[in-house]
């Protein structure tokens, strides 16, 4: 997650030892909040994974809050986040603000059951994995890549079906093309557990 092109606010904390300045995201990390903003890339995934592992080392028994506003991106990068979410001991609660599309929606659905949320005007989109960039080369190589893509598609559909409590056939049908959902529709589908109007509506 890079904010190099934006002015990142700084928070000043005072203690008996004086003042200390944090950028806003480091301060929120102290509250166990992790952000995925923008495309899922190797770089953004590495940052998320590092923060998840750090928060586990700080307190393995306290929930982590994973906020997602992402159009999706790399499957392999996203799976590194997914595997880490399952590997660490703390529950990972997911929350969509803005949008969670493609791999973003997959990660949203992978939060701890009962702790997956979206804000009311969020947009969620699921679809089948795409080949990024131009695929060229020999016909046999293209065939190998096509078989691999089909295996990835089957794996993602199977995992998302488990998280949504749906049959694999439902996911195969519903991800065949871009499938956009409102927050309420995502709840009905099983991608999230609750739409949050405000903090007071949070039910755990």
Swiss-Prot record:
Reaction(s) catalysed by this chain's protein: Hydrolysis of proteins to small peptides in the presence of ATP and magnesium. alpha-casein is the usual test substrate. In the absence of ATP, only oligopeptides shorter than five residues are hydrolyzed (such as succinyl-Leu-Tyr-|-NHMec, and Leu-Tyr-Leu-|-Tyr-Trp, in which cleavage of the -Tyr-|-Leu- and -Tyr-|-Trp bonds also occurs)
PROSITE patterns with a match to the protein in the record: CLP_PROTEASE_HIS (PS00382), CLP_PROTEASE_SER (PS00381)
UniProt cross-references to Gene3D superfamilies, sorted A to Z: 2-enoyl-CoA Hydratase, Chain A, domain 1
Subcellular location: Cytoplasm
Keywords, comma-separated and alphabetical: Cytoplasm, Hydrolase, Protease, Serine protease
Gene: clpP
Active site: 102, 127
UniProt main location, coarse: cytoplasm
Enzyme Commission code(s) on record: 3.4.21.92
A single cellular component GO annotation: cytoplasm
Function comment: Cleaves peptides in various proteins in a process that requires ATP hydrolysis. Has a chymotrypsin-like activity. Plays a major role in the degradation of misfolded proteins.
Top-level lineage group: Bacteria
Principal EC category: hydrolase
The protein's assembly and partners: Fourteen ClpP subunits assemble into 2 heptameric rings which stack back to back to give a disk-like structure with a central cavity, resembling the structure of eukaryotic proteasomes.
Keyword Cytoplasm in record: yes
Matches recorded under SUPFAM superfamilies: ClpP/crotonase (SSF52096)
UniProt xrefs under InterPro entries: ClpP, ClpP/crotonase-like_dom_sf, ClpP/TepA, ClpP_His_AS, ClpP_Ser_AS
Keyword Membrane assigned: no
Gene Ontology BP annotations: protein quality control for misfolded or incompletely synthesized proteins
Lineage of producing organism: Bacteria, Pseudomonadati, Pseudomonadota, Betaproteobacteria, Neisseriales
Family: Belongs to the peptidase S14 family.
Name this polypeptide is given: ATP-dependent Clp protease proteolytic subunit
GO terms, molecular function: ATP-dependent peptidase activity; ATPase binding; serine-type endopeptidase activity
């Amino acid at each position: 997650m890079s904010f190099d092109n934006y002015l990142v606010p700084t928070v000043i904390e005072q203690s008996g030892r004086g003042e200390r300045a944090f950028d806003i995201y480091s301060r929120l990390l102290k509250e166990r909040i992790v952000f995925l903003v923008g495309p899922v890339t190797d770089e953004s995934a590495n940052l998320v994974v590092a923060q998840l592992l750090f928060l586990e080392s700080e307190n393995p028994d306290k929930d982590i809050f994973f906020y997602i506003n992402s159009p999706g991106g790399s499957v392999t990068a996203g799976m590194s986040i997914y595997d880490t979410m399952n590997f660490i001991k703390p529950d990972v609660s997911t929350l969509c603000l803005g949008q969670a599309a493609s791999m973003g929606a997959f990660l949203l659905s992978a939060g701890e059951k009962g702790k997956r949320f979206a804000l009311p005007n969020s947009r969620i989109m699921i679809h089948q994995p795409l080949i990024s960039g131009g695929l060229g080369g020999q016909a046999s190589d293209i065939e190998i890549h096509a078989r691999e893509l089909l295996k990835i598609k089957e794996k993602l559909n199977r995992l998302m079906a488990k998280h949504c409590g749906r049959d694999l056939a439902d996911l195969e049908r519903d991800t065949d093309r871009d499938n956009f959902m409102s927050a309420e529709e995502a709840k009905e589908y099983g991608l999230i557990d609750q739409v949050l109007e405000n903090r007071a509506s949070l039910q755990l």
